[in-house]
Curated annotation (Swiss-Prot):
It comes from Methylorubrum extorquens (strain CM4 / NCIMB 13688) (Methylobacterium extorquens). It catalyses: (2R,3S)-3-isopropylmalate = (2S)-2-isopropylmalate. GO terms for molecular function: 3-isopropylmalate dehydratase activity; 4 iron, 4 sulfur cluster binding; metal ion binding. Pathway: Amino-acid biosynthesis; L-leucine biosynthesis; L-leucine from 3-methyl-2-oxobutanoate: step 2/4. Binds 1 [4Fe-4S] cluster per subunit. It is an enzyme of class 4 (lyase). The lineage of its organism: Bacteria, Pseudomonadati, Pseudomonadota, Alphaproteobacteria, Hyphomicrobiales. Keywords: 4Fe-4S, Amino-acid biosynthesis, Branched-chain amino acid biosynthesis, Iron, Iron-sulfur, Leucine biosynthesis, Lyase, Metal-binding. This is 3-isopropylmalate dehydratase large subunit.
Amino acid sequence: MTAPRTLYDKIWDDHVVDVEPDGSALLYIDRHLVHEVTSPQAFEGLRVAGRTVRAPHKTLAVVDHNVQTSDRSKGIEDPESRTQLEALAENVRDFGIEFYDALDQRQGIVHIIGPEQGFTLPGQTIVCGDSHTSTHGAFGALAHGIGTSEVEHVLATQTLIQRKAKNMRVTVDGTLPRGVSAKDIVLAIIGEIGTAGGTGHVIEYAGEAIRALSMEGRMTICNMSIEGGARAGMVAPDETTYAYVNGRPKAPKGAAFDAARRYWESLATDEGAHFDREIRLDAANLPPLVSWGTSPEDIVSILGTVPDPAQIADENKRQSKEKALAYMGLTPGTRMTDVTLDRVFIGSCTNGRIEDLRIVAKMVEGRKVHDSVSAMVVPGSGLVKAQAEAEGIDRILKDAGFDWREPGCSMCLGMNPDKLRPGERCASTSNRNFEGRQGPRGRTHLVSPAMAAAAAVAGRFVDIREWRG
């Protein structure tokens, strides 16, 4: 009789091709997502070696990082970005890979288009040259980012050399209070364990509060597993998962779907399976959260104040937090509800899905963006944009004064024209608040879509639990 296994154990075991004496394993890869930034050198390596792509049908390419989200008829002005986009178009043509270019309605952020196309499925191993590949773990898949040399290896062999990580489980029980979302859950987790807390582990998210989330909410949580230091994040597939996947363009159909579902249902963690680390949170006690520093672990309640680094005993950590406050232009003791804003960014692979945009529209309908704020909403894909427009969400947002954009990574990172100016302070639904992440000397506060929407209207952070509408 085999020992009880975790969700991660089962997927790992099902994909191991060979194990070396040193413990490293050759892992079969089911799905490979490719974008313009981390793939050019990989494709060039294939050309130099005279190799082909082993499984083009298991690879899907899209442009997202460098595409502009304003008028695309003008083309890409930045020469380096333009070169990367042109290189991807040439590479996918030469190697026979399916590709969504900037004019394809299916185009969007790689971690949004994979799930919505049904390319992402439970039980799969999924890789991409992007750290937020962990997003796909929401489907009960083993998904993680890889480097450019590994991108080349997967293209050539459909395998990857890996060492098995440890198992970690984060259980979130209880019911989320009004105004608290999946984004607040994952920020709370990172605030609890720190940005190194998941190092060397794959996290399985479990518990009543996780099960109650939509697939969009689960993707938000798994997306930021990397910010907690983990290799990947996962949620066991269930009825919510199957309902989302069923009918997607690339998902199995009919009897094939039924057979796949029977396998997916076998993936749940066995009773008594061993976890190397366990963390528990009570959802009922969570407030809306906002980041104050330059690390995703720098989290405080909306009703809290900027912490005082002088209270930190560890000298290195104290100096780090003092540096963060200086960069952010904040003073210890400042109430978060007194922090005013210049910009609001709603989008990214963390919070650029239709559920997120519906929440924002509900928050701002009949209201106006504050005079001191420039606010933009960037749908995560062309299909999300089309659905939002069909529901009238774009009209609500534009009437409120939001800039309604084309899909792409946008202001999540400073690799395209959407950037903060030096010193600007932004409420952002993205995943990283590092120095310069959204533009040189830009100041980023991580929040949920509802918190960002309310901040755009108020011109400062507010407690959305008191929001009417």
